[in-house]
Amino acid sequence: MRKNRLGNFPSMALDVTVDNAMVFYLGGTYNEVGKPNENYGRELLELFTTGIGWYTEGDVKEAARVLTGWKASRFNDQPAPKGIYNTWFDANKHDTGAKEFLGVTIPARTVDNNTEFQVLNEEVFELIKIIFRVRPDAAARFIARKAYLYFVYSSKGDVDESFVNDLAAEFRAANFDIKPMLK
């Protein structure tokens, strides 16, 4: 998170999505083809990007399918291809079927293109980009509101909606780069 703290929010969201701590904390390690774990998919939408009301239960399920196969090793007795405390991808646990997220199709993949690099770039990053492409106003406003509540005034009852709208417009105009919004 530190790397992108004032950078591009979608890039930070991608980093957080496949971060070992997040994968482990929200049960991503148990998110596998045939039994997707919806925890992170829901949090990504509800708490990190758009807020409630901008997605369906089906979108949460499809986000969970996109995120199948990512593992986090925490202990020495667990598989750890990249060492403990590192995220890794198990292609055998990834759902290779097509996904429909926020009305956009993420194509199915074959065994040949079901690698960590390809899934990260063609599915996980695409998932993040879809949120900001399909729901740009909702995401900009939601994140600007969080910034306002953190940096300006913490009482949710006294939010200056006009100021939040200005922050959101700046954030969106800057292609979701954080620093211009905070200036």
Question: Where do the model's predicted regions map?
Answer:
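Active-site substrate-binding loop specific to GH73 endo-beta-N-acetylglucosaminidase modules
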Residues: 1-183
